[in-house]
């Protein structure tokens, strides 16, 4: 995820890394855990199974969240899933330049925006 935030006057403004991490994590199948014990692995695996999120879905959800943040004048979201079952990786990317101007219906455009899946 790359962003270019600006304040209301067009000047640079800081965005906390934790805010961007939250956008990424809430766009995924489940939260990220740095360490899991065996009993917790089943819970996390089942949660991911019950709420599958493909890379295309993840970048769309993150783009919706970022497009609602008035500080963002530009952003790009990429997601890669290294497949464990298939012999390929899934990739998706969306750029705010693909979206309508602020004030238009961004979520509707995100449903039809071109997202690469390989």
Regions found by a protein language model. Give the residues of each.
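N-terminal intrinsically disordered, cationic/polar leader segments
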Residues: 1-118
């Amino acid at each position: 995820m790359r962003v270019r935030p600006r304040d209301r006057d067009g000047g640079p403004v800081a965005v906390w890394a934790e805010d961007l991490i939250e956008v990424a994590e809430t766009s995924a199948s489940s939260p990220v855990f740095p360490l899991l014990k065996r009993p917790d692995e089943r819970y996390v695996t089942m949660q991911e199974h019950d709420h599958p999120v493909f890379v295309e879905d993840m970048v769309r959800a993150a783009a919706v969240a970022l497009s609602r943040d008035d500080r963002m004048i530009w952003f790009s979201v990429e997601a890669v899933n290294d497949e464990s079952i298939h012999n390929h990786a899934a990739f998706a990317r969306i750029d705010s330049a693909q979206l309508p101007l602020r004030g238009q219906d961004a979520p509707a455009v995100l449903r039809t925006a071109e997202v690469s899946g390989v």
